[in-house]
Structure formats: structure tokens, C-alpha cells
């Protein structure tokens, strides 16, 4: 079983090794014209950012309050993601599903989530908007968790878990496009690393709190509400960042109509 689960990652690793290059100039699957256009576009973007920033050090990325704010946003989405991974099978089992049924049922929301993520990311790119795509996705996931805490049938809990999966999956692409809107170079590398490191702590806190709360209450409901609160907080933080960006002409954080 473990070998079968590892095979897709092994195959993908080989594909990435040969096809995912570090620069457009090395991408053999692009035409010469496409490589030249991408290189020029990246250089133009870098010059535009450099003109607005006196320096772009790693420390600048770590000290930027927007980085810490996005880390908090990612904390909430990570809490939701790992809650699904760890507790969804147990929640489904509590409605009387067999082990085989749990395997199939648990896979369904993930398939829908992948489709939603692709469509939502394309819509975000097409509209050149980031903030509300993250906000809407986080609120959908929060609503799904609240719904999951109040359902009484296997069908309704699957609907709830699908909503959560769709929301969390859809939030990722627009969220990860945000740091490079105001950081570049070493600052971007440090900032993204900080967001990832701090945010991933949510993957520990969310599932742990569900277990702790379930031991105290005998139910999953209040634990799910707790994680829903973290996702709602993520949405609120993005709202605040967007409002600040709209008020300040020099603030380069994702607000409506920013690419």
C-alpha cells in the first residue's frame, strides 16, 4: 500500500527533474520567442520593483508586517487542511461507514477540490484579483466546518466536507501569489519561507485542538467550530490588508484589481 502511494510522487519527481527548469531560458518545451518574452517580462517586473524599493534584503522580507499577516492567513488554511487529512476519516466513520467506504468517500471531496482550485485560480488570474478570492475561499471553508458540526447524516457530512475541501484548495493559488506582489529577490525568498514556516504550525494546532476539545465534549462539533474560527480570522486579516492597500497608494499588497 505504501509503495502504491509513493509511486505518483516518484513519477512526478522524474518529470519535474527534466521539465521544471529554474529559468525560462532553459525550458526546452518553450519556443525561442516564448522564452525571450518571458525573460524580458521578468526583467521588466524586477526593474519596476527595484525602482520602488531601496533595497530588498532577506531581513526586509522577515520584518515586513504583511509577511507576518500572510503567515497568519496561511496558519488558518493549514489548520483546515490538516484537520481534513487527519479527522475526515474519523468523522465519516462516526456515521457508520465501513473502512472501504471511508476510503472512497474521503477521496471524493479531494477530487472536487482539485477541480475547484484550478477553476478558481484561473478566475483570479483572469480578473487580476487576489484578496477576495482568498477571502471567499476561506469563508466557504469556515461555513463548511460549521455545517459539518451540525449535520446528522452521512450525505450531509459529505456535502460539508466537500465545501471545506473546495474552500481550502481554492484559497491556495491566490494566497501564494500575494507575497511576490510586494517582495522580490532575497526578501521574497525569506518572506515566503517565513510564511510557510509559521503558517504550517496551523497544521499542528488545528487537528490537536479538535482532539482536545472532543475529549472534553465528546463531540467533533466545537473542535470544527474552532478551526472555522481560524479560517474566518484568515479572511478578516486579508480584508484588513486589502483595505490598507486601497487607502495607501504606495502599499503593494493584493487588493481588488491588483495582479
List the predicted regions and their residue ranges:
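Interfacial helix-cap and linker-helix signal at transmembrane-aqueous boundaries
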Residues: 92-93, 123-125, 209-218
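Loop-to-transmembrane helix entry/capping segments in MFS-fold secondary transporters
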Residues: 99-100, 185-195
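C-terminal transmembrane helical hairpin of 12-TM major facilitator-type secondary transporters
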Residues: 128-178
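Symmetry-related core transmembrane helices of the 12-TM Major Facilitator Superfamily/SLC fold
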Residues: 2-18, 224-239
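Paired intracellular helix-loop junctions of major facilitator superfamily
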Residues: 179-189, 218
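Transmembrane alpha-helical cores of Major Facilitator Superfamily
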Residues: 3, 75, 107-111, 193-201
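Intrinsic disorder in cytosolic terminal tails and internal cytosolic loops
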Residues: 30-50, 241-259
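Extracytoplasmic gate region of multi-pass secondary transporters
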Residues: 59-121, 172, 176, 206-207
